Design a protein with these regions (language model features):
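Nucleotide second-messenger and two-component phosphorelay signaling modules
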Residues: 15-19, 31, 49, 85-92, ...
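Structural preference for long, well-ordered alpha-helical segments in enzyme cores
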Residues: 9, 42, 61-62, 75-83, ...
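Inter-domain helical "communication" segments and dimerization helices
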Residues: 1-23, 67-70, 80-81, 88-89, ...
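Alpha-helical scaffolding segments of alpha/beta enzyme cores, especially the outer helices
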Residues: 81, 112-116, 143-153, 199-206
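EAL-family c-di-GMP phosphodiesterase catalytic domain
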Residues: 1-5, 32-33, 49-51, 101-108, ...
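Active-site core of bacterial EAL-family cyclic-dinucleotide phosphodiesterase domains
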Residues: 2-61, 160, 217, 243-247
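Catalytic core of bacterial c-di-GMP phosphodiesterases, primarily the EAL and HD-GYP domains
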Residues: 34-41, 67-143, 219
Length: 259
C-alpha cells in the first residue's frame, strides 16, 4: 500500500494553522555598546497534542515535501499583524527578522506576496528583516541575487543567517548585497581560548563594517563573550546571556511597554 506522506503532512499543517498550533516566539537582539533593544528574531514552535515540538524536528519535513512556503507565509503574516498592533498601541517598532526558505525566496509569487502583506497591515518594510542562509544562496546564486535586489527595492532589510557554517561564506558576501551578517554561535563557543578564532572573528567584523554591513553575534552565553564583543565593536548580540526565545506576550511586557 502506498502512503502519501506529503498529503498527510499537508493536512496536519493546514489543521495546525487553523487551530493556532504554531506559536511565534521572539528572541531579542541588543546593541553591544549600549545594551538597548535592537530588534528580535521570530522563531516558531509547534504546540502539537500539548507538547511543544521544536523547529529542527518539523522544518526539515516541510522542506522535504515542499510545504515550507506555507509556514514561511504564516510566520511573516503574523509578524506583520503584530507590528500593526504595536503601532496602534504606540510602541516603538523594532525590526523583526524572519527566516526565508529557499523555496519561498525563489517562488515566482514571492514579491507579490510581500507587497500584499505590507499593504494589508500597513507595515514599514524597513522594520522587517528577511533572513537568507548560505544554503539558500549556494543553491542558485543568480536567483539569490535577483531575490535580494527585489526585496531591497521594496525597502526590506536583508540579512545572512548562520554565517560561517557553509563552505562559501566569503564568496556570498561578494555576490549578495546584505545589510546584516549573523555570525553563527560556533564562532564564539571557544573564542576566549582560541587565538585563531579571535583573529577570524575580528577580521570578519572589520571586513563587514568596510562593506557597510552590521554584524550580529549569535548564541552568546557569557559575560566574558559580551565584553570581548564590545571591545572589537560587534554591532549587536543575541543569545541566552540576555534572553532565551520567549512568547510574544512576554516580549511585549518585558521590552515593548518600556522601550
Amino acid at each position: 500500500m502506498n502512503i502519501d506522506y506529503r498529503k498527510i503532512l499537508e493536512e496536519r499543517l493546514k489543521k495546525g494553522i487553523k487551530n493556532n498550533e504554531f506559536v511565534i516566539y521572539l528572541q531579542p537582539k541588543f546593541y553591544t555598546n549600549t545594551g538597548k533593544l535592537a530588534g528580535a528574531e521570530a522563531l516558531i514552535r509547534w504546540n502539537r497534542d500539548g507538547k511543544l515540538v521544536m523547529p529542527n524536528i518539523f522544518i526539515p519535513l516541510f522542506e522535504k515535501y515542499e510545504l515550507i512556503t506555507v509556514l514561511d507565509t504564516y510566520v511573516l503574516e503574523n509578524i506583520c499583524r503584530l507590528q500593526q498592533q504595536w503601532r496602534k498601541q504606540e510602541y516603538n517598532i523594532v525590526p523583526i527578522s524572519v527566516n526565508e526558505s529557499r523555496l519561498h525566496l525563489y517562488n515566482e509569487n514571492h514579491i507579490n506576496d510581500l507587497i500584499d502583506l505590507v499593504n494589508k497591515y500597513n507595515v514599514q518594510p524597513n522594520t522587517i528583516e528577511l533572513e537568507m542562509t548560505e544554503t539558500t544562496v549556494v543553491h542558485n546564486v543568480e536567483l539569490a541575487k535577483e531575490a535580494e535586489k527585489n526585496v531591497h527595492k521594496l525597502g526590506f532589510i536583508v540579512s545572512m543567517d548562520d554565517f560561517g557554517t557553509g563552505y562559501s561564506s566569503f564568496s556570498m558576501l561578494k555576490n549578495i548585497n546584505i545589510d546584516v551578517l549573523k555570525m553563527d554561535k560556533s564562532f564564539f563557543d571557544d573564542v576566549l581560548e582560541s587565538r585563531r578564532g579571535k583573529i577570524i572573528i575580528e577580521a570578519v567584523i572589520e571586513m563587514s563594517h568596510k562593506l557597510n554591513i552590521k554584524v550580529v553575534a549569535e548564541g552568546i552565553e557569557t559575560k566574558e563573550q559580551v565584553e570581548y564583543l564590545k571591545n572589537i565593536k560587534c554591532d549587536m548580540i543575541q543569545g541566552y546571556y540576555f534572553e532565551r526565545p520567549i512568547k510574544v506576550e512576554e516580549f511585549e511586557e518585558k521590552y515593548m511597554k518600556h522601550y
